Amino acid sequence: MYLIGEALIGEGSELAHVDLIVGDKNGPVGMAFANALSQLSAGHTPLLAVVRPNLLTKPATVVIPKVTLKNEGQVNQMFGPVQAAVAKAVADAVEEGLFGDININDICILASAFLHPSAKDYNRIYRYNYGATKLAISRAFEEFPDEKTLIHEKDRAAHAVMGFKVPRLWDPPYLQVALDIVDLGKLRSVLSSLPENDHLIIEAGTPLIKKFGLNVISEIRAVKPNAFIVADMKILDTGNLEARMAADSSADAVVMSGLAPASTIEKAITEARKTGIYSVIDMLNVEDPVGLIASLKVKPDIVELHRAIDAEHTSHAWGNIGDIKKAAGGKLLVATAGGIRVPVVKEALKTGADILVVGRAITASKDVRHAAEEFLEQLNKEEIDQFRIMTDF
């Protein structure tokens, strides 16, 4: 047996995070159990979980501090409410039948417990660690999460301790606001006016990046820390280097020009994958977008069918979106840019567009928030988890 469980419960400095492994005494878990009790280190001394002095919990459980214990107060918290909570949770799990028909004398548990240096409230420390241990045991035996749950949940919420969300584009359609602004004061004003919405993407436009460099991504993050930010660099050369620069600036996506050599595009896409950001090909002035996508050895995450600002008076030419997606193997988002206005949103969505790129219709509006909300309303998408009550994850 080798089962793994994890749970985080609580809030503030007293929150509890318990990682545990359940396994046979005569296997690798048993060996790790013995090593934990025999190979001690200052500030991380493991301790057997006892319900009270002289009453060992079963299955035998060793509590391992994750954080270095630096003073008497922390030691008292670990040997007091944390240890008692873990021991009681294990004992209650036995009583409630979580271990099934397993002989509790044949297995043992490694429980790694987090204790924040600023924690003070013994009552909360106990209750949070009890709940986290109990939930971690339950999850271990349920082998939680299953693949379906993992895929469904991985992009939905922010990590409770990290404090910010890293957005991913899994629930189209989206509105992408193109910031082709070259004044930082105006930029901050527009950003502050944009509504908070899971379906709103922010684009650092090419003029903005040329004026202020990629450091402008940090300016955007200062106002919109949870935003999905696209760096529209229109890469034409040194694809891997410029894609890495975009990733290092904390952009979520980087744009390359479809007019670049295929090798440059492929290097940029590969580098974007390595750094965990999205790759976007801008098809401005590309005669055969379908042919280009089909010819690439590695496919982008997004294709942008983009008409230049100087050509917006011409008729819509978004191409055959279905053929583009087919050429990419089906797993591709398509953005439409140039001349997008509220009355044509539905038309663009009907063609298969996943992202609508809008610039001056929002950024030059007298009421930026209202203009953005008009477009978002046309998407007819609820906020992700708007009606969900978050509990364990």
UniProtKB/Swiss-Prot annotation:
Gene Ontology MF terms in the entry: 3-dehydro-L-gulonate-6-phosphate decarboxylase activity; carbon-nitrogen lyase activity; hexulose-6-phosphate synthase activity; hydro-lyase activity; orotidine-5'-phosphate decarboxylase activity
Leader peptide range in chain numbering: none
Protein's pathway: Carbohydrate biosynthesis; D-ribose 5-phosphate biosynthesis
EC category: lyase
Binding residues annotated for substrate, in chain numbering: 19, 48, 66, 68, 83
Region entry Formaldehyde-activating enzyme, spans: 1-161
Region feature (3-hexulose-6-phosphate synthase): 162-393
Keyword annotations from UniProtKB, A to Z: Carbohydrate metabolism, Lyase, Multifunctional enzyme
GO biological process terms, semicolon-separated: 'de novo' pyrimidine nucleobase biosynthetic process; carbohydrate biosynthetic process; L-ascorbic acid catabolic process
InterPro entries: Aldolase_TIM, Fae/Hps, HCHO-activating_enzyme, HCHO-activating_enzyme_sf, HPS/KGPDC, OMPdeCOase_dom, Ribosomal_Su5_D2-typ_SF, RibuloseP-bd_barrel
Name listed for the protein in its UniProt record: Bifunctional enzyme Fae/Hps
Species assigned in the record: Methanospirillum hungatei JF-1 (strain ATCC 27890 / DSM 864 / NBRC 100397 / JF-1)
Gene: fae-hps
